[in-house]
Amino acid sequence: MLFRSRFPVCESCAGITSKLKAALEPYGIALNVDLQCEPHHVSADSGFVKKLLEVYEDVTGEKGYTVALGGLTYVHDTENGVAFGAEFPGDENNMHNADEFIRTESLLLNAKIYANAILRLCGKDE
């Protein structure tokens, strides 16, 4: 049997694994771990995240906010990396579907946000 799980940021992979093994042992079930990744979390209070939120707010005029995801994103192994974009409130969520698309207006707004974020993060926005 294959068991896939994501670990909360408040516990290490080793801690969860030892608890699972202890819970399964009385039932004669062995747990073999093939792959494990430590949880990835970047605080909303980090300077990096604050700059990204500032750019979003400056470009859109809307209040930015952070969302914690349980999924494994492309930034999981990037220290202090965060996923940023690309959907806006009210957009149809069609990411990763067979007919994936983005509205032209959203694509252009994302490009403007990303360009400004790069400038801000590089200190070139003055």
Spell out what each predicted region is.
Residues 5-7:
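Hydrophobic beta-strand positions in extracellular immunoglobulin-like domains
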Residues 11:
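Active-site pocket-shaping loop/turn-to-helix segments
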Residues 14-26:
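Short amphipathic alpha-helices in soluble, non-transmembrane regions
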Residues 30-126:
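An extended, acidic, His-containing surface patch that forms the Zn2+-binding/catalytic region
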